[in-house]
Amino acid sequence: MLQAIYNETKDLMQKSIQALNRDFSTLRSAKVSVNILDHIKVDYYGTPTALNQVGSVMSLDATTLQISPWEKNLLKEIERSIQEANIGVNPNNDGETIKLFFPPMTSEQRKLIAKDAKAMGEKAKVAVRNIRQDANNQVKKLEKDKEISEDESKKAQEQIQKITDEAIKKIDESVKNKEDAILKV
């Protein structure tokens, strides 16, 4: 019964860390990633559709992305969606593909993006702490219902704290690695 709580807590915290790493992939670092376009939706016959669902997105080099739509009539719509997304780049439509030329990041931009990464890390820590609180509440309920003793409850809460500390440490490492990648010139 306690082991199930530990396992669920670890699993939920791991999912929070994975979500953080997914969020990090949308932040720009030295090399532009195709993931920077993940949040962009294109109006595809009246339905907001992810950009990578209406064409292929590939990286040509460290500062250039190319979008090749599967239907040429979507070029204007993709171009409009990118402009509205305000990602700091103007789309270059050549009639076949759209190229995005990202300028090199200034040190000021790098600092702002690193700050965003840190904020994402803090959000993940809050999620982990909420998971810890839920797990501790489950343990306290078991103690209240006389299913476990007070000593078992204290040991369980200590174990949950150890799991939380591990998750927070992983989040801190992820944030540090991402900040290093962003600030590296």
Curated annotation (Swiss-Prot):
Coiled coil spans: none
Q: What does this protein do?
A: Responsible for the release of ribosomes from messenger RNA at the termination of protein biosynthesis. May increase the efficiency of translation by recycling ribosomes from one round of translation to another.
Q: Which gene encodes it?
A: frr
The record's listing under InterPro entries reads: Ribosome_recyc_fac, Ribosome_recyc_fac_dom, RRF_sf
Record-stated family: Belongs to the RRF family.
The GO terms this record gives for MF are: ribosomal large subunit binding
> What is the protein name stated in its UniProt record?
Ribosome-recycling factor
Q: Name one GO biological process term.
A: translation
Look up the record and report any one GO term of the cellular component aspect: cytoplasm
Cell location: Cytoplasm
Q: Which keywords are on file for this protein?
A: Cytoplasm, Protein biosynthesis
Q: Where is this region: Disordered?
A: 137-158
Q: Where is the composition biased (Basic and acidic residues)?
A: 140-158
> Is the keyword Cytoplasm in the record?
yes
Can you name the source organism?
Helicobacter pylori (strain ATCC 700392 / 26695) (Campylobacter pylori)
